From Swiss-Prot:
Chain positions recorded as ATP binding sites: 527-535, 551
Localization per Swiss-Prot or TrEMBL: Membrane
SMART domains on file: B_lectin, S_TKc
Domain Protein kinase intervals: 521-795
Name this polypeptide is given: G-type lectin S-receptor-like serine/threonine-protein kinase LECRK3
A Pfam family annotated for this UniProt entry: Pkinase
Similarity remark: Belongs to the protein kinase superfamily. Ser/Thr protein kinase family.
Membrane-spanning segments: 465-485
Active site as annotated: 645 (proton acceptor)
Catalytic activity: L-seryl-[protein] + ATP = O-phospho-L-seryl-[protein] + ADP + H(+); L-threonyl-[protein] + ATP = O-phospho-L-threonyl-[protein] + ADP + H(+)
Glycosylation sites: 26, 39, 59, 219, 226, 237, 242, 321
Cytoplasmic side: 486-811
Cellular-component GO terms for this entry: membrane
Length: 811
């Protein structure tokens, strides 16, 4: 009987508990928060998370509107409100002062500053109530219970279990751990289905080349952090690509988060939350998986500083999953609190007016163990020894670092700013950085300098004695000095007449005709012939005996002389892995010869149009190499260079089938402030752009057009024009490729090529890029920067319109 009396009391107690839980779960209209006081946050039912005002680290008077882990000592922030910056696409964190109010009223959530001005709202109306869920998701719901807005749909730098990122969303790293502004990295779920990680320029927001991608263009769907701790990218066919593979025994024993950290690494973290897990795990956030595994090696951008700031280098501690940026010897951070700004020398820059001896007395080259800056090259020498490599950098006021490779006897000089610096145990080359010489430091040049000083002292003493001994001797000495001065001036004039100007530093080597005649064995072995001359194989007659290719200009007419000078002035002052290297030249009497590095695999023309098709992977490698070479010519040289004669015959392949652009005889150099030029028709039938036949200025887009033709030839392993094909519609490749693309039959272009068929998505991407390059209107063609991004899959490719039916190169 007693238990029957107790039943109504139990029912009343349960009803009260239900009402109490409902009050905690639903945040009703009229509720508000202020930064200070007890009413500064709304707590989830389990108290694991809170939404509200969070004091900015190191600034007690400034507050974020945020979501954070409520039971952890440091109250780790996982979401923070942001607003657009001056109407631009980029955003800034919302930070307010004491006296601000966040209020849920009139069907909306609004944050106002102490003056009553609205500083943030989630842009939704008809809100009935809000909820702070135990998942860490803060939701605004309508009176019907439908979600109007949620923090999970507007992520900051972190995702949590059960959170899904759909197409078009992104994570932005913070600038610093305590600075919530958009940082230097993004993880984007692109609308084209590709999941991509980008370095991000600060403060412009410009995206550099990606350092990681899922390579799921047109296939990706969403990024998922599921309840079991797995993070994966779903594919439209239902399959999954694992992004992290961390496994924890019990999800209930840990808090979880995955954050795009300030160093660009996407880390999955766990934190023990109960007594069962704490004996085994430290009471702190522990990274259990990372992407990419080595950010220092993953980032290498042609534009931008790399993983760390300019003139610094990146190092990684694999055991702790941490990344650091360091300055080299005699350098210091520009801002110790913002190391991403890079390093600067702590010594005065070298005066370019110093003579060689003074420079060697003031500066030295210090070796750096296991550190490299792979880019920033502006000069290369081969063959050469390490002592000479050091000397050439010391006496050059532009040189900051010299790299010497003993195996190939090659020296590279690098100038400021140094980019993409990284520490790597596998650096095979000797890296030397220029530093000021201390007064007691030994020098590789010290003995030579001392001897020079000693010789100079005795020369002055001897000269003084001679001048004091006899008028006749004085007369003879003066005569000899005058004659020597005359010879020196005459010699300099001859050099100026015989040697084209080269403002990039030391010019290519000047060979005598007899040296090249001997090197080629009397010009016996022909490698190829062109309009301006014949190319012969040779071997330098020195201790290294490297193979060379010697181009002999056969007819010394005015146009041939002009092409010779252009070749030396363009390729002689450039260096890039995808440009053929000019080792030297001969300008003796009527003889004009150019000396290049030897390319063992010949021209792309021979490689591509042989009886057996080259592997698809090699063709992709060549296409990317040619694109990067043109990008360097168009956008990264001191002066823009338009090649004007891009074709397979002018693309050479080295031992590893790396593409090298060659033959710059028709090239045009443009000053920095000039983007177009007027010139006569240049190039080769089948590859020239339509504007050559019109009375309009010529721009770098003529090379883009030619590249489009070459790209189609690389995809299809056939020439642009083939008159002997069975199907007349296939005669002109550019027409046929466009027809196949429109009909969705790209496979016809690579019929019989199993490797290409297997990579049909990439084939389709390459064809689309080619069709964009072939647009008749130059302004519609992409730049080579955009071309490289499209080829790499870093940007979405819109459907190309039909190129004009007029193929001017065939006229």
């Amino acid at each position: 009987m007693a238990h029957l009396l107790f039943l109504p009391i139990l029912q009343l107690l349960l009803l009260y508990c239900t009402k109490s839980a409902q009050a905690q779960l639903n945040i009703s209209i009229g509720s508000s928060l202020t930064p200070q006081g007890v009413n500064n946050s709304w707590i989830s039912p389990s108290a694991d998370f809170a939404f509200g005002f969070r004091a900015v680290d190191g600034n007690s008077s400034s507050y974020l509107l945020a979501v954070w882990f409520n039971k952890i000592a440091d109250k780790t922030v996982v979401w923070y409100a942001r607003t657009s910056s001056n109407g631009k696409d980029d955003t800034i964190p919302v930070q307010v002062q004491s006296g601000s109010v966040l209020k849920l009223a009139d069907g909306a959530l609004s944050l106002r500053d102490p003056s009553g001005n609205e500083v943030w709202n989630p842009q939704v109306t008809d809100v009935g109530y809000a909820r702070m869920l135990d998942t860490g998701n803060f939701r605004l719901l309508g009176t019907d219970g439908a979600t109007k807005w949620e923090s999970f749909g507007d992520p900051s730098d972190t995702i949590l279990p059960t959170q899904v990122l759909s197409l078009g969303t992104a994570l932005h790293s913070r600038l610093l751990a305590t600075d919530y502004s958009n940082g230097r990295f993004q993880l984007k779920v692109q609308r084209d289905g590709n999941l991509v990680m980008y370095p991000d320029a600060v403060p412009s927001g410009y995206l550099y080349d990606p350092y990681w991608a899922s390579n799921t263009v047109d296939n990706g769907s969403q990024l998922v952090f599921n309840e079991t701790g797995r993070i994966y990218f779903t594919i439209i066919n239902g399959s999954q690509v694992n992004i992290t593979s961390a496994g924890v025994d019990s999800m209930g024993d840990f808090f979880h988060r995955a954050t795009l950290d300030t160093d660009g690494v996407f880390r999955q973290y766990v934190y023990p939350k109960n007594i069962h897990a704490r004996p085994l795990w430290p009471e702190q956030w522990t990274a259990v998986d990372v992407l990419p595994e080595n950010i220092c090696q993953s980032i290498q951008t042609m534009v931008g500083s790399g993983a760390c700031g300019f003139n610094s280098y990146c190092t990684i501690d694999g055991t702790k999953n941490t990344t650091s940026c360091l300055c080299p010897q005699n350098y210091k951070f520009i801002d110790d609190k913002r190391k991403y700004k890079g390093c600067r020398p702590d010594f005065e820059p070298q005066n370019c007016d110093l003579d060689e001896t003074t420079a060697m007395l003031q500066y030295d080259m210090a070796p750096i163990d296991r550190v490299d800056w792979p880019l920033s090259d502006y000069e290369q020498y081969n063959p050469i020894d390490q002592t000479e490599c050091r000397r050439l950098c010391v006496i050059d006021c532009f040189c900051a670092v010299a790299v010497f490779d003993k195996a190939s006897s090659t020296c590279w000089k690098k100038r400021f700013p140094l980019s993409n610096g990284k520490m790597d145990v596998n650096v095979p080359r000797t890296v030397l950085i220029k530093v000021p010489r201390s007064t007691n430091s030994p020098s590789v040049f010290s003995s030579g300098s001392s001897k020079w000083k000693e010789d100079k002292k005795y020369w002055i003493l001897g000269s003084s004695l001679l001048f004091g001994s006899s008028v006749l001797v004085n007369f003879l000495l003066i005569s000899v000095m005058l004659f020597g001065t005359y010879c020196s001036i005459t010699s300099r004039k001859k050099i100026q007449l015989s040697q084209p100007s080269n403002k990039s530093g030391l010019p290519p080597k000047i060979f005598t005709y007899s040296e090249l005649e001997k090197a080629t064995g009397g010009f016996q072995e022909v490698l190829g012939t062109g309009a301006s001359g014949v190319v012969y194989k040779g071997q330098l007659q020195d201790e290294f005996g490297i193979n060379i290719a010697v181009k002999k200009i056969e007819k010394l007419q005015q146009e041939a002389q002009k092409e010779f000078l252009v070749e030396v002035q363009t390729i002689g002052q450039t260096f890039h892995r995808n440009l053929v290297r000019l080792l030297g030249f001969c300008n003796e009497g009527t003889e004009r010869l150019l000396v290049y590095e030897f390319m063992s695999n010949g021209s792309l023309n021979t490689f591509l149009f042989s009886d057996t098709h080259p592997h698809w992977s090699l063709r992709v490698q060549v296409a990317l190499g040619v694109a990067r070479g043109l990008l360097y010519l168009h956008e990264e040289c001191n002066k823009q260079i338009i090649h004007c004669d891009m074709k397979p015959q002018n693309i050479l392949l080295d031992d590893n089938f790396a593409a090298k652009i060659s033959d710059f005889g028709l090239a045009k150099l443009l000053p920095v402030n000039q983007t177009q030029t007027n010139t006569g028709i240049r190039g080769t039938r089948g590859y020239v752009a339509p504007e050559w036949f019109k009375n309009i200025g010529i721009t770098s887009k003529v090379d883009v057009y030619s590249f489009g033709v070459i790209l189609l030839e690389l995809v299809c392993c056939r020439k642009n024009v083939e008159l002997e094909v069975l199907d007349e519609e296939q005669t002109i490749l550019t027409y046929w490729a466009n027809d196949c693309y429109k009909c969705g039959r790209i496979d016809l272009l690579v019929a019989g090529d199993d490797e290409a068929i297997f990579n049909i998505k990439k084939v389709e991407r390459f064809v689309a890029v080619a069709l964009w390059c072939l647009q008749e209107e130059p302004s519609m063609r992409p730049t080579m920067l955009k071309v490289t991004q499209m080829l790499d899959g870093a940007v979405q490719i819109p459907t190309p319109p039909d190129p004009s039916s007029y193929i001017s190169s065939l006229a």
